């Protein structure tokens, strides 16, 4: 597999290299960055991707792919036969269990998947390389600014220039700090932890989400525990929590995982952990996601669903959007990208963040969970929210409920923030 190419031009002055040029520079080789590179390179752009990790690195994740993510993989023509197919979601709230298939007849496929990130990321970045993108591993790239405009990057002692630079480096790092693309301080964020274990139920075709978690003090946790069967003899087991919960600063993720493990160990016949549990932070906002000469995509743009911590699908979609726009007109891409993302995602994600302030109160969380799975109709709406299937274009009952909720919570936003747990 080729991971370097000669697609980037080398501008020279005499015998000394001055700068390398390309049509598009991408900081980060995860799903979002790879999606941008695939789409742009197939469209004829000269693309260079930088990642500070080595090829084949793992990424801490739940490994679940929603039908929305599958639709994006289909659009990118990335095969996923090796992934474990998932038909729906099992939601558990106290003694209530509901098993629901992913909706059919929508603009998304009727199935999802579980695909460990090491293999998913490799398939995507290999696709970018095959399309002609140059991939530079173990190379940290930092934006180069001319005034307030990003004109390229410095990486590995060299400099590249391009009409557009895409920030796809996940949770904020040095590049995000330089561009002011960090998390908004008073907005919610999430923490999650996961590991793997062997299970005879590894081939189940449903994701399982336990919505009624409690910390070691018995306080309800706004978040969920998950069992994601990988189809390879193992399951991904983890828990996630929102920063809006009462007592969040004292939350012990390892203890929360052990508590959840105790709930599911028998029903899933779990073996010992196959690796040490690993935790990560889930950004759910960004101070900036575009500026002259640059855009941020995926996690770097805060595109994570507060209701489930999922963002792979949003990363793939935002990467495709950015690539299509830069192929059309790099000069106007940042502003058009921001409008496109706002139209598609901002309403739903802002509503999710506001809702997270509500469910940070234990009594509201308990009441809300009873409602969320109380009837088939409400459970189906919950399924679509948990599956990232709701956005500004969603039709039908789920769309109407979302838009009504959006209006109410937008009006109540100041009160929600003042009265947070």
Predicted feature locations:
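Beta1/beta-strand and adjacent pyrophosphate-binding region of the FAD-binding site
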Residues: 17-32
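Glycine-rich FAD pyrophosphate-binding loop
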Residues: 25, 38-61
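Conserved Rossmann-like nucleotide-cofactor binding loop
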Residues: 32, 55, 172
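Predominantly flavin-linked oxidoreductase catalytic cores and closely associated redox partners
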Residues: 43, 127-267
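Conserved N-terminal glycine-rich FAD pyrophosphate-binding loop of Rossmann-like flavoproteins
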Residues: 53-76
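A conserved beta-strand/loop capping segment in the N-terminal third of enzymes
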Residues: 70-123
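FAD/FMN-dependent oxidoreductases across multiple families
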Residues: 243-326, 331
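C-terminal helical "tail/cap" subdomain of flavin- and related membrane-associated enzymes
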Residues: 324-421
């Amino acid at each position: 597999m080729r991971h370097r190419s000669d697609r980037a031009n080398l501008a020279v002055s005499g015998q000394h290299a001055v700068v390398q040029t390309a049509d598009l520079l991408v900081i980060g080789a995860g799903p979002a960055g790879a999606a941008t590179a695939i789409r742009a390179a197939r469209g004829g752009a000269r693309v260079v991707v930088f990642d500070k990790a080595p090829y084949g690195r793992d990424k801490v994740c739940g490994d679940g792919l929603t039908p929305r993510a599958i639709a994006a993989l289909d659009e990118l023509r990335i095969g996923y036969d090796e992934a474990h197919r998932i038909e729906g979601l099992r939601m558990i709230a106290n003694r209530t269990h509901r098993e629901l298939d992913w909706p059919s007849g929508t603009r998304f496929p009727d199935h999802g998947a579980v695909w460990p990130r090491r293999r998913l990321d490799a398939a995507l970045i290999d696709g970018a390389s095959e399309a002609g993108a140059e991939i530079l591993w173990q190379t940290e790239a930092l934006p180069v600014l001319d005034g307030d405009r990003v004109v390229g990057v410095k990486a590995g002692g060299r400099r590249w220039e391009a009409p557009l630079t895409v920030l796809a480096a996940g949770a904020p790092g040095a590049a995000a700090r330089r561009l002011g693309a960090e998390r908004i301080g008073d907005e919610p964020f999430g923490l999650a932890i996961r590991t793997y274990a062997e299970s005879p139920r590894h081939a189940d075709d449903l994701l399982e989400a336990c919505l009624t978690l409690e910390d070691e003090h018995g306080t309800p946790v706004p978040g969920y525990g998950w069992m994601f069967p990988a189809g390879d003899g193992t399951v991904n087991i983890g828990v996630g929590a929102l920063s809006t919960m009462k007592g969040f600063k004292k939350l012990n993720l390892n203890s929360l995982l052990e508590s959840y493990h105790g709930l599911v160990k028998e029903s899933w016949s779990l073996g010992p952990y196959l690796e040490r549990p690993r935790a990560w932070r889930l950004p759910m906002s960004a101070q900036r996601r575009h500026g002259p000469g640059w855009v941020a995509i995926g996690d770097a743009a805060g595109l994570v669903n507060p209701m489930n911590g999922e963002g792979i699908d949003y990363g793939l979609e935002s990467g495709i959007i950015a690539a299509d726009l830069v192929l059309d007109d790099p000069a106007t891409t940042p502003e058009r990208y921001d409008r496109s993302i706002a139209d598609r995602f901002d309403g739903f994600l802002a509503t999710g963040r506001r809702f997270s302030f509500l469910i940070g109160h234990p009594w509201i969380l308990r009441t809300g969970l009873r409602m969320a799975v109380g009837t088939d109709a409400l459970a189906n709406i919950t399924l679509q929210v948990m599956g990232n299937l709701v956005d500004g274009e969603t039709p039908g009952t789920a769309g109407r409920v979302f838009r009504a909720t959006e209006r109410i919570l937008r009006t109540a936003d100041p009160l929600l923030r003042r009265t947070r747990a």
